[in-house]
C-alpha cells in the first residue's frame, strides 16, 4: 500500500484534497500535517512514499521542508503544490530537491482524471527539471 503525506495549512483545502484523493485512489494510506514541524514528526512515524506540500506554510515553507526531507529521506518523492505557479518558485522548488512542482488547479485536475486503479507516480506531466 502506497503512503502519502499531505502538508497544507488551509484545513478546508486539506480536507477537500484528502477526500478527493481517497475517492479516486482508495488504496492509498493518507496522513496529513498542517505545518513543517508536524510534517517532520509524521515523516518519522509514517514513512510516506510521497509527500504533497504547499509552498507557503506557517513558520517555515515547503522549500525548507523539502530540503529537510531530501536530506534525511532522499528516496521520498516530494511534490510541491501551490497557487503560486511562477518560474522563480518552480526553479526554487527544484533547487530545494522537489521532484515535481504543480499548481493546485492542475493537481486537482490530475487527481480527478485518475481512476482507482492508477498510481500517482504514473503521471509524469511535470517531471523534475521541466521548465
Regions found by a protein language model. Name each.
Residues 54:
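Active-site residues of response regulator receiver
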Residues 58, 86:
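The feature encodes the CheY-like receiver
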Residues 63-74:
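Short amphipathic alpha-helix used as the core "switch/output" element in two-component signaling
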Residues 8:
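Conserved acidic carboxylate
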Residues 32-50:
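Acidic, metal-coordinating helix/loop segments flanking the phosphotransfer/catalytic sites
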Residues 11-31:
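Two-component/phosphorelay signaling modules centered on CheY-like receiver
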